[in-house]
Amino acid sequence: MIKHKGKIISLDPTRHYSSSSNSIAFLSHAHTDHIFYPSSYTGKVLASEETVRIAYARGYRYSNVMSTSEASSEGLEMIDSGHVLGSKALLIDGKILYTGDVCTRDRAFLKGARLPRCDIMIVESTYGMKGFRFPSIDDVVHKANMLISDLYAKGLPVILMGYPFGKAQILTNLFKHWAPIYIHEQVLKINRIYEELGVDLGVHDAIAYTHAKENGMLDKKPWVMIAPKQSNDTIFIRYMKKHYNAVTVAFTGWAVAKMRMHMHMYMKHDYTLPLSDHCDFIDLVNLVRSCNPSKVYTFHGFADEFASYLKSIGYDAEPIHALSDDVNKNEKLLYYI
């Protein structure tokens, strides 16, 4: 949390947030691990229009949302973070930068983050460990297209999987040229919101999974389906394999993981390709260098490892750990450890 001009700014609160009338909850994006149910919240909410709209569709209904001009009057500026549609970093008084989840790579219709210089940087470190290095998106798309082509030649349908909000819309856009293409309802719900918000994903008059199934369309193989990421042992995937001999392809940054503790994250699919909505290790290092802060706080994922590396190359860096009831105070930064 940040104390600023007599107000407490909670950064991506999920449960632990200040609920006084002088509090501001900043929501960097609408993934459910970055938002909260506002039933007892009396403060203001700062988020992009897209985040508020998508959160609403997912059952999180916020009132008292700050306008851009109101935020600006408080010295608060939201900047595209490149993670998902509507994702934002937060710059406070031109000095303190909170990245939220961030990606500096362009992907399909989504532009990578270009963040400003700052004095204090609070940076995510999901992949903040050496060894996490992603190939270019062009390489991943080429490999996926070659794989789909090979499977099509064998008459096998393909299920392309990613998180239903964010990754799945990128997959829809990147692989829209395959036909026929079907969209799982969980993905289609978010796709339609993207289109309402002016993003053309390129799949018009999309056919939903249930409609295709009930009308025998899935029996006419091969085909491509965009679906939420799930393992091969889920009921849905077991059904698709049993009845249609479908092949699963998951897209996740964890595909490059070599540590045994992360093997479960990418081994339960037929194929896994490294496409992430986060920065890899080198991207994170370059991001810190471009922002050139005098102090860096790392959070999430490999926060300890990334802070240690930054210290080894000359930065004043330390990790922020899990939430607890103990509050440590810095002159400008309040955070739970």
How would you label these PLM feature ranges?
Residues 84-92, 102, 106-107, 118-126, ...:
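Active-site-proximal loop/helix segment associated with metal-binding centers of metalloenzymes
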